[in-house]
UniProtKB/Swiss-Prot annotation:
Protein name listed in UniProt: CCR4-Not complex 3'-5'-exoribonuclease subunit Ccr4
Keyword Protease attributed: no
Gene: CCR4
Lineage of the organism: Eukaryota, Fungi, Dikarya, Basidiomycota, Ustilaginomycotina
Stored PANTHER family: CARBON CATABOLITE REPRESSOR PROTEIN 4, POLY(A)-SPECIFIC RIBONUCLEASE
Any Gene Ontology biological process: transcription elongation by RNA polymerase II
LRR repeat boundaries on the chain: 165-186, 188-209, 211-232, 234-253
GO CC annotations on file: CCR4-NOT core complex; Cdc73/Paf1 complex; P-body
Signal sequence annotation: none
Low complexity: compositionally biased ranges: 9-39
Ranges of biased composition (kind: Polar residues): 123-136, 646-670
Length: 670
């Protein structure tokens, strides 16, 4: 049989086999070792190795599949994985049809916020993007397996590595002495069989193939394994019997199996060089020309910067979720110092953190950041309401830190989405609200800040929406409720009289009559890519009630009339394009964290750039030794646009805020 691109030989030649005496000696030694250790793990090695040795004929796997299919009534021919006897879904390069394997469960969505799976199974793609369907058969890949086994090949053609969609590659029982590092391009491989060759080493790039479930390297000349293979966190079977493997690896495999070997390699892997510092990208402010000329050298021109960072809550950072991360790099004692150092190094005026534990906030971050002139506002998720104090300290939430030498906190507010939903009359008849929104305990935190020198004001909202891509309707509802609360808070803030006095050299403090006249920041982990309804709603100010992200669920006026807000918002990264990702794991990478700002009151003047691409080419995901969370921080700098200033008032104002349905609390002026 021939395959596309001339990958297979047109004729079937017999492969050169190993010496019978060598094979028998290896089998006898392995059997003796297994018997001596009584290890089920090594017994499994022997069984799999024997199956591999019986698969040394040309195109063995493809021929076995064809033979098995002759008696089947279906026209599909399933190539079988000989190691399991289980149908491997695909179509081989030699033209054999096979069933398609679904690996979505392995790759999943962005790891975040509880890391569980939702009860609702509505189709959705990672982090809330609407599912994409293809109606064209020619757009669908019809094969994903290549069987090049038993052909006495000395080299693999480079064209093979162009087929990045491959999920199974059989290059067993050839005469290969090396594997090309280009194999890193086959990121979707779940099965790789390179048994029965002459390999004395395997490339460290194999560690980038994090979807691998089975890696067969039986009967080669391997004395050791590269520690980079420690990132193969989904590997179920590492076949190395028949190799002169060093004693420590062999004994570990005998005693504890594949998982233990991978963990050992992962934790002993040398730490690579850190990446270059992320570039700070300057952006020309969009101030009108006359205004820009007037204030070009004005020392009273106000600017501030905002940092947003999901720091990965300690209780979510488990070895099960982040099996590719060294245990020492996943430990909170290591990560917390790295996070604190990173936040302090950027020295942002306003820092918005998500997934901050109560204990971490009270005992660590507040303590250290207060020494850098920060004060903080923090609320845990709604579940903390009903917990004992010791349990409550193990709940995460959202925190806003601000420079206390620059800003005064006027009001802080907790936004509990499930509690707000209870108070809306139009939601009371919605089963979807009770079944989908009320069961999620996500929150947002709002802080109303006033500049101590100029009297100008800022509304800051820090949010962490639900993570599950199957609940993108819930994310949209949560953000809609957040914008409702931001507008209410802004309206209260606008009613307050201006600051009684300002610093010398500053113009009179601004007077605000409407909420949208106050500079406003909406930032956080939205768990939504730019193509979703959440981003569309924030950036455009409205989405229709029949938007696809509602998924035909009913949410009172939200779906009856559509969503809208009165702010002119834009993501701060729009001038350069959203970052390639803010969440980076083997199963998902994409932009889901944003800093939105009001364009009529603020100009973005700079943003923190992306991570070095060369560094990323050798990294399977975060967290790792250099990045302590599965998210990266984002940061932007803003200029406050000048507005008409009223005359300063000498009358001291009385600070009073009406009670909000979402737990607003006011702070007296100092």
């Amino acid at each position: 049989m021939s395959s596309p691109g001339g990958l297979h030989s047109a004729h079937l030649s017999s492969s050169a086999s190993r010496s019978e005496a060598v094979a028998n000696a290896a089998n006898a030694a392995a059997a003796a070792a297994a018997a001596a250790s009584g290890s089920p793990h090594w017994q499994q090695q022997i069984v799999k190795a024997e199956i591999s040795r019986q698969s040394n004929s040309p195109h063995h796997h493809a021929r076995a599949a064809a033979l098995a299919a002759r008696s089947a009534t279906s026209s599909a021919i399933a190539i079988q994985d000989p190691s399991k006897g289980i149908v491997t879904p695909q179509v081989a390069a030699n033209g054999l049809f096979v069933a398609k394997k679904d690996s979505s469960a392995a790759n999943g969505g962005g790891a975040d916020d509880g890391k569980g799976s939702g009860a609702d199974t509505a189709p959705a793609t990672t982090n809330g993007a609407a599912p994409i369907s293809s109606t064209s058969a020619k757009d669908k890949q019809t094969w994903s397996t290549i069987d090049m086994g038993g052909l006495a090949l000395k080299n693999i053609a480079n064209e093979v590595y162009r087929y990045s969609f491959l999920t199974s590659l059989f290059i067993n029982h050839n005469a290969l002495t090396t594997l090309s590092s280009d194999i890193v391009k086959l990121r979707h491989l779940t099965v790789l069989d390179a048994s029965g060759n002459k390999l004395s080493s395997v490339p460290p790039e194999l560690g980038m193939l994090t979807s691998l479930r089975e890696l067969f390297l039986f009967d080669n000349n391997l004395a050791t394994l590269p520690p980079e293979l420690g990132t193969l966190h989904q590997l179920e079977m590492l076949g190395v019997e028949g190799n002169p493997l060093q004693d420590n690896l062999r004994s570990l495999l005998q005693r504890e199996g594949t998982t233990a070997v991978i963990a050992y390699l992962r934790d002993s892997c040398p730490v690579p060089l850190p990446p270059p510092e992320r570039e700070w990208i300057m952006i020309d402010p969009d101030l009108p020309d006359l205004d820009a000329d007037k204030h070009a050298n004005d020392a009273t021109q106000e600017s501030f910067n905002v940092l947003s960072y999901n720091i990965l809550f300690d209780r979510y950072a488990t070895a099960q979720m982040y099996g590719y991360t060294p245990s020492w790099a996943l430990a909170w004692d290591y990560r917390k110092e790295f996070i604190l150092q990173e936040v302090m190094s950027y020295s942002a005026d306003i820092c918005c953190l998500q997934e901050v534990g109560v204990e971490q906030y009270e005992d660590y971050f507040l303590h250290h950041l207060s020494q850098q002139d920060y004060e903080g506002v923090f609320y845990p998720k709604s579940r903390a309401r009903t917990m004992r104090d010791d349990e409550r300290r193990r709940v995460d939430g959202c925190a806003i830190f601000y420079k206390s030498n620059k800003y005064q906190l006027i009001e802080k507010q907790l936004v509990e989405f499930n509690q707000i939903a209870l108070q809306r009359p139009d939601f009371k008849k919605s089963e979807d609200m009770y079944n989908r929104v009320m069961t999620k305990d996500n929150i947002a935190v709002i802080a109303l800040l006033e500049n101590k020198l100029s009297g100008s004001r800022i509304v800051v909202a820090n949010v962490h929406t639900h993570w599950d891509p199957a609940f993108r309707d819930v994310k949209l509802v949560q953000v809609a409720m957040l914008m409702d609360e931001v507008e209410k808070a802004g309206a209260r803030f606008a009613k307050l009289p201006p600051k009684p006095s300002v610093a010398e050299g500053y113009p009179p403090p601004p007077k605000y009559t409407h909420a949208n006249q106050i500079p406003t920041i909406i930032c956080g982990d939205f768990n939504s890519v730019p193509e979703t309804g959440v981003y569309d709603f924030l950036a455009n100010g409205a989405v229709p009630g029949d938007h696809e992200d509602f998924m035909d669920h009913v949410y009172g006026n939200y779906t009856a009339q559509g969503l809208q807000h009165s702010y002119k918002l834009e993501s701060s990264y729009v001038p350069i394009g959203e970052l390639p990702f803010t969440n980076y794991t083997p199963g998902y990478e994409g932009a889901i964290d944003y800093i939105f700002y009001t364009k009529n009151t603020l100009s973005v003047t700079g943003v923190l750039g992306e991570i070095d691409k060369q560094y990323l080419s050798k990294v399977v995901g975060f967290p790792n030794a250099h990045f302590p969370s599965d998210h990266i921080c984002i940061m932007s700098e803003f200029n406050v646009k000048r507005s008409d200033r009223g005359s300063s008032s000498t009358t001291a104002r009385e600070v009073h805020h009406p009670t909000s349905s979402s737990n607003a609390s006011s702070m007296p002026r100092r």
